[in-house]
Amino acid sequence: MTKVGLRIDVDTLRGTREGVPRLLATLHRHGVQASFFFSVGPDNMGRHLWRLIRPRFLWKMLRSNAASLYGWDILLAGTAWPGKNIGNANAGIIRETATYHETGLHAWDHHAWQTHSGHWSIRQLEEDIARGITALEAIIGKPVTCSAAAGWRADGRVVRAKEPFNLRYNSDCRGTTLFRPLLMPGQTGTPQIPVTLPTWDEVIGPAVQAQSFNTWIISRMLQDKGTPVYTIHAEVEGIVHQPLFEDLLVRARDAGITFCPLGELLPTSPESLPLGQIVRGHIPGREGWLGCQQAASAS
C-alpha cells in the first residue's frame, strides 16, 4: 500500500463557493480525507493577467486552456473592481470543511503573496500571516495548526516568519521528503512537508494529454521514492475536472494507493526528520521562482 498526502489548495472565491462543496462530496463518497488550505482575504487573482506579457506564463495559460479551466470570473477577479473577501462570503463552507478535514492557511491575499512576498520584510511577512491565521481561526473556531505558502513562494525568510505561530507543520516548497528546516546552527524550524508531484496545470499539454493524465500521475505516485504528496486545486479538480478527479480516486484505490491528510505523514518524533532548507528555484511547467527543498549542507 502506497500512502500519498493529498493537499487541496483553495485560491479564489469561486473555488471556495463551488469547488470545495463538490470536493467534500466527492471525498465523502470515497472515504478519503485530505488537507485543505484556504485563502481567506480578498480575491484579486485576476490581477495576474498582466503576467501574460511573460512568454512562459502565456504559454502555460494557452497550454492549459485557462479560460475554460478556471472561468472568466476567476481570471478577472479584482481587476476592474475590489476583490471580494473570500472568508466572509464562504464562512459556512470553510467551517464544514474543518469539521471533516485538516484545514490550514493558504494565504490572506493569494495574489499579493505570490506577487510581493519575495521582497517583503520579515515583519511584513509576519503581519500578513497573522492576518490570515486570525481570520481563519475566527471562521473555524479553533487554532490553525498548518499552512501552505501560496504558489510555493517561500524561502528562508518565510520559514523564519512562520516560527512565532507555533504551527504543527508547513507545506511551503517542492521537494522529495519531509524535513526540518535549519534556521541557524543548532536551531531548526517547524517541519516541512514538500509537494513532490506535479500539478495538473504544470504538465497538461503536448507531453501529457488530459485523457491520459490519471494514468500518468498514478504511475508517478507509485514511482515516488520519497514521501509522495500531491496537490489539487478547488478551481480545477473541484469544478471543470471534478469527474476526472473522481476517476483518479477510483484508479488510485485499485492501484493500492491510499490518500491521507498531510499531518498523517509526520513521524511520532519530528526530531528524527533530516535537516534541510528552502531556497528559490524553478521547476518545469511553472512560471517564476518557488521554494525548493535543498540539503542543509548545500551552499
Curated annotation (Swiss-Prot):
Record keywords, A-Z: Antibiotic resistance, Hydrolase, Lipid A biosynthesis, Lipid biosynthesis, Lipid metabolism, Lipopolysaccharide biosynthesis
Cross-referenced Pfam families: Polysacc_deac_1
Organism whose genome encodes this protein: Salmonella dublin (strain CT_02021853)
UniProt-recorded Gene Ontology molecular function terms: hydrolase activity, acting on carbon-nitrogen (but not peptide) bonds, in linear amides
Gene Ontology BP terms: 4-amino-4-deoxy-alpha-L-arabinopyranosyl undecaprenyl phosphate biosynthetic process; lipid A biosynthetic process; lipopolysaccharide biosynthetic process; response to antibiotic
Keyword Isomerase: no
Catalytic activity: 4-deoxy-4-formamido-alpha-L-arabinopyranosyl di-trans,octa-cis-undecaprenyl phosphate + H2O = 4-amino-4-deoxy-alpha-L-arabinopyranosyl di-trans,octa-cis-undecaprenyl phosphate + formate
Pathway: Glycolipid biosynthesis; 4-amino-4-deoxy-alpha-L-arabinose undecaprenyl phosphate biosynthesis; 4-amino-4-deoxy-alpha-L-arabinose undecaprenyl phosphate from UDP-4-deoxy-4-formamido-beta-L-arabinose and undecaprenyl phosphate: step 2/2; Bacterial outer membrane biogenesis; lipopolysaccharide biosynthesis
Known role: Catalyzes the deformylation of 4-deoxy-4-formamido-L-arabinose-phosphoundecaprenol to 4-amino-4-deoxy-L-arabinose-phosphoundecaprenol. The modified arabinose is attached to lipid A and is required for resistance to polymyxin and cationic antimicrobial peptides.
Protein name as it appears in the record: Probable 4-deoxy-4-formamido-L-arabinose-phosphoundecaprenol deformylase ArnD
GO cellular component terms, A-Z: membrane
